[in-house]
């Protein structure tokens, strides 16, 4: 009940139920200048906490939906590990004899005889061609089926792309159009099991046609399945595996159970529509591959999944999935996050990967997932369970297309040395999700410690195109879309496997991605030395929650540079600090970014207590301030350009020390150029504030040791520098002057806060100094000049003892 109440509260907070939820706002009044510091925008930190709480609810709904124990795998060994084979009708038969001529399908007394054959009935040894040309003979004679672009690499003993193949034994499975393929397949493959060797692997051809499937298919080492133009449709009503390696759960373990497997082609329709009790707990995995080395699945189409994975790998090394299509899932099932391609670990804890023994914790390494299509599915590929002390290594996801993916496209959990690059994702709930660990962590046998929280993950997300859907809720709980999400994990109390501590994500590079649509662009939390560069983030404002362009929450050593961000409902680029980042010597850098049209502040550093710098950024047309620093310390705002923002150009508030505001240009902002509010700053120098509607600098109750060499021009308020309750400082007004005519021989007026006033004349693009005057105790000045022609442009520049200057322009009458 508490969870349901919390879900309702969160839904209301995020606007999911249509109930209005007041935005966090701050309105501060100080005398006549109240309108300079009145702010009404959503508090980014509160907004992010609400979003994270909602997504935590989603995580709790995503429970693994593995096959129920009562649904045995037809034609696979029973759960007791016996040596017998279970037939499709559930009966148990003894071991198959050497003479397979009496084998029948589905337990019938049919007369079909299964045999090895070439075209004329014998096995043929076919030499693998030396060239690398693509197979163009899918419709030719059977002897042509051995040609393949990557065949030499598919059975390599080392990397998936290396090695040479000897000869194939080419075999054609004898089946008729519309026939149940289960028993003929398992009979033939079992006979070939001992004949297929590393030197002479077997290539089995399924002829083009349409076939049914009523049980689990078994495949063994050194086998190449060629199934192009074959359509295999599951017609059984139970939930069972479609295909596995071996006919028993037991193997040698590690990566040594099976080797050299190729599945080439076929349309595999899992046909969830035929399954009884679809809404009961559990789905069924399609192809389940475990404890294996050198596995290739290519050119295949997988359709209509029921609450689980199309392909599942556990403890596999050197795998390639290329040129495949995954489409269709049971849409009534919204709680889970089962991936089309699941990269998993060998453990039976929580029913994670029960199909292969031993449960030794072996993870996956050296995967290439390239050129596939994922369409109208719940989740694309990745991992949602892990082993303590082990990682998934060298997973490469490139050149894939994701379209209409409800949740995540790519999920890297506990990965290292891995890449997601040049993928296209359109109308998706999340592009790339990277996380260090999760509560779904299992104990590795013989390992008693937790994950290595100092490990450099060396992960790269680059060159992807991501267009986010307008999804606001899934299963009645708010869903927050994100283009790229990088998350550490805060284990707040000791668990069964994970000890209490913070597990950051270290060493992630996010670069050259294009992100658009509804949701957050790039988000990071509890990260360490991660880099976000050269990305284009073009968001649309959402009605249900307030989205961000790029944010780094409680992170150390983040570099956010050369990105373009626009259109967010909240802050364009946001950094916030907390427990993990506090006191870190690693510097956060926000540099050379362009932010426009943000619904909140352009760049916002909130409660950041580690050394952080925002420099050389351009921020324009934000609904809040251009650059804002709230609380925290040791932050720098250097060399930025802030123009046409609806609040201040630069806003500094409640900081406790070590903040420098230097060499910024703040222009045409709706309020003051620079606001200093109840802050301890180190330096305000070298800034240029012009054409702002308020003051050049507005300072209230702040400590300012140095304020020098700032330039103010054509700001709306008389006070170029407005100071109140700032010890040791007085305001600086712009110089005023009496009317200057063509007969005038002097320019006179007042210049409060300045020491001198200089007059210049501008003619034909050239500037000539006319004279200078000191300012007396009555704040008056008189500059003697020669008579000037009518309509001559004059410029008056006042300067105080710290080199701060105020410029006004006038014309000779």
How would you label these PLM feature ranges?
Residues 729-813:
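Ser/Thr-rich low-complexity repeats and stalk/linker segments
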Residues 212-216, 234-240, 272-278, 284-285, ...:
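Short glycine/acidic-rich loop motifs that flank beta-strands on beta-rich extracellular proteins
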Residues 255-404, 409:
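Right-handed parallel beta-helix
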